[in-house]
């Protein structure tokens, strides 16, 4: 583990046994922390220089940010992209997308999909992709995300001693609280 942006430390902890750097483009469980584009670009440079893979985990954020993948706006091309959640529209489905360099090492039987042989999962995935590829889908995600962001900012402004920050991109949003989250969870 390393603090994002501390690329000098990262370079020092990479050894000859390091195969890849893997990061969530938006850290979901880590507090909806968006990895800045400059950071993703630097990670790509480091991986290229060290001849290791860059894995950008899109399990939680793919299709939900206003673009197909959250990393797209950075211009970075990862070697491996795990996806799930959004691709199944709530139905269990996941996949592992790889570039040509990585695909050479994948032989028959290599794990590339969760529920991939399940006809229902594949039908659901196809239906989700049909919706995602509809005209203006991503524009609508951005528009609704802005509306959501504005609403959350109003709540933050109303409760400045409780809410520190509104985070997120598109429809992935989170609030950084100034009070213990357990208080709110208990009241649910």
State the predicted function of each range:
Residues 1-188:
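Conserved N-terminal phosphate-binding loop of PLP-dependent enzymes in the Aspartate aminotransferase
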């Amino acid at each position: 583990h390393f603090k994002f942006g501390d690329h000098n430390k990262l370079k020092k902890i990479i050894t000859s046994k390091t195969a890849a750097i893997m990061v969530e483009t938006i850290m979901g469980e880590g507090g909806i922390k968006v990895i800045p584009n400059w950071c993703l670009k630097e990670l790509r440079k480091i991986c290229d220089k060290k001849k290791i893979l860059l894995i950008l985990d899109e399990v939680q954020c793919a299709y939900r940010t206003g673009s197909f993948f959250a990393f797209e706006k950075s211009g970075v091309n990862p070697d491996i992209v795990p996806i799930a959640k959004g691709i199944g529209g709530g139905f269990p489905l996941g996949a592992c997308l790889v570039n040509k360099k990585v695909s050479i090492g994948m032989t028959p039987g290599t794990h590339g999909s969760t529920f991939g042989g399940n006809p229902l999962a594949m039908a659901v995935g196809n239906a989700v992709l049909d919706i995602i590829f509809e005209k203006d889908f991503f524009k609508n995600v951005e528009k609704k995300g802005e509306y959501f962001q504005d609403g959350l900012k109003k709540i933050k402004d109303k409760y400045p001693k409780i809410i520190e920050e509104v985070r997120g991109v598109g429809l992935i949003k989170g609030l950084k609280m100034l009070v213990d989250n357990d208080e709110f969870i208990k009241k649910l």
